[in-house]
Regions:
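Non-catalytic C-terminal accessory region of glycerolipid acyltransferases
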Residues: 92-196
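Structural signal for hydrophobic
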Residues: 22, 75-76, 137, 161
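A generic structural signal for well-ordered alpha-helical segments
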Residues: 13, 53, 76, 100, ...
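Generic preference for hydrophobic
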Residues: 22, 36, 60-61, 81, ...
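Residue-level "edge-of-site" marker
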Residues: 26, 89, 143
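Short, basic, glycine/proline-bearing loop/turn elements
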Residues: 9-10, 78-83, 110-114
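Catalytic core of membrane glycerolipid acyltransferases/transacylases, capturing the structured
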Residues: 30-88
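Membrane-anchoring hydrophobic helices of lipid-metabolizing enzymes
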Residues: 1-35, 44-45, 73, 80, ...
Length: 196
């Protein structure tokens, strides 16, 4: 279903808004697992990231509240999304993404939440997962419309991918590694945004 949904949504967005531009796709690791972290404001950037990385499927981390209704839960599960408790993250948050990465899958995390505390938790989660799984983090920035109205206004959609960020294995000084990597990710986001 993931492939069908990606191709279908790609067609719909093309008809509404024209072709999307993907920059630096050649920087993606080939045949190796990685974590992609992307800026996030609406459902449109999630869809566009999936389209940009296609045919590589992304397993999206999504807030558990979206899985409360059975129908929505079934759809999200078929679209490779898995739930996470953002308000009370614990060791179990690492289990699913680590299992996916071990199977050489790609995990998508959107750290730009509605609250600064949530953004930090999600960024830290991505860093800890990358360290434990020994996989790189690929920063991505979406620039474009965030509403149906803006899509119809033909505002251009662009996904820009950055250089791989390699997180060292966590030692006793986990906090320093996390903070340093957080700064690198934030700086990468800003640099990618400035490319437009």
């Amino acid at each position: 279903m993931y492939t069908f949904a990606t191709r279908f949504l790609q067609l719909i967005l093309f008809l509404m808004n024209g072709r999307m531009k993907t920059v630096n796709k050649e920087k993606l690791p080939q045949n190796d697992p990685f974590i992609v972290v992307c800026t996030h404001k609406s459902w449109i950037d999630v869809v566009c990231l999936g389209i940009a990385l296609y045919p590589i499927p992304i397993h999206f981390m999504a807030k558990k509240e979206l899985f409360n209704k059975v129908l929505i839960k079934n759809i999200l599960t078929k679209l490779n999304a898995f739930p996470v408790d953002r308000s009370n993250p614990g060791p179990s948050v690492l289990k699913t993404p680590l299992q996916l990465l071990k199977k050489k899958q790609v995990v998508g995390i959107f750290p730009s939440g509605t609250r600064n505390s949530e953004e930090k938790v999600l960024k830290n989660g991505a860093i800890h997962i990358a360290s434990r799984a020994s996989v790189p983090i690929i920063p991505a920035v979406y620039i474009g419309p965030h509403t149906i109205k803006d899509l119809l206004g033909r505002k251009r959609r662009t996904i820009i991918l950055g250089d791989a960020i390699h997180v060292p294995k966590m030692t006793k000084d986990k906090e320093s590694v996390t903070e340093a990597t957080n700064e690198v990710i934030s700086k990468a986001f800003e640099e990618l945004k400035s490319n437009i």
